[in-house]
């Protein structure tokens, strides 16, 4: 619950979002020309923000199935619940003028959830809590690297 509130705070009130509310202009983007992730040649604030947008939502891949045990039987139930919640939050950002409805954000947030869920599933397979946490962290790292490589390939050769 606390983590969810923290994410909502960042989505609505950080990064000078209150300055955006003054304009009373709906901001939205329903299209994407690329996956907003890449392998950096040089680390920049934009890249950190983009990768942070993935990793910030990875914990929901653990929190949703753990909080609602009925959701943990498959990937699709918690994924659908997360997807609906992210769409709702993106819409709220737009209608409150504290952000924008951005399809790329939904895509990247959902990738983060999926990474978290896959890592959680792998970490649960061991009996030791310590080993489970290590496996979880290793999978988060590994899957994030794989995601960056895939996004770079798709952006460069397929889009």
Tell where the protein language model's regions lie, with residue ranges.
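Short capping loops/turns at secondary-structure boundaries
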Residues: 99-100, 108
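Alpha-helical transmembrane segments and their membrane-interface exit regions
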Residues: 108-117
